[in-house]
Amino acid sequence: MTEKSTDVYLGMGAIVHEGGVAFRVWAPHADAVFVKGTFNNWSESADPMKAEEHGTWYTDIPHAKVGDEYKFVLSNGNQKLERMDPYARQVTNSAGNCVIYDPKVFDWEGDRFELPPFNELAIYEMHIGSFFADSDKKPGDFDSAAEKMDHLKRLGVNAIQV
């Protein structure tokens, strides 16, 4: 279970727990912060966050669940800003929405990976959204990048930094 301290879950971003999902974001200059997403019909006011110490904001949403999409809405004076969660573990794409993800469900066992020797590494640094896109209107995604792996392999690339 996720670590809890006096009814407040510890951590940043979307924090999955048995009773829903807690959210925490650092926004020291905001006057107000809300979470909007599929769990509240993208309402910009249904789920306000409470200011904590040191510029963080927190809320716990019992009806939010793994797989729901979300964004933060920050208010500062007359400005209203919609922002992605910098701690999101999954996103729809680099300009899209965050997705609530439970890191405890990932299978870390059974994979055999051997790193090539240091002097043989050919590392390609990749930004998924700009590596390859099917159209100019939408950023690339992991599926479109995966289609081009054979090309990178032919070039001699044996490691990718995402």
Model segments located where?
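The feature marks proteins involved in alpha-glucan
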Residues: 1-22, 44-47, 51-125, 130-137, ...
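Short proline/glycine-enriched turn/loop motifs at strand-loop junctions of beta-rich domains
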Residues: 26-33, 64-65
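Short beta-strand elements bearing conserved aromatic residues within extracellular beta-rich modules
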Residues: 33-35, 70
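Predominantly extracellular/luminal cell-surface or secreted proteins
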Residues: 36-38, 75
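Gly/lys/ser-thr-rich phosphate-binding loops in alpha/beta enzymes
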Residues: 40-42
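Catalytic domains of carbohydrate-active enzymes, especially glycoside hydrolases
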Residues: 147-162
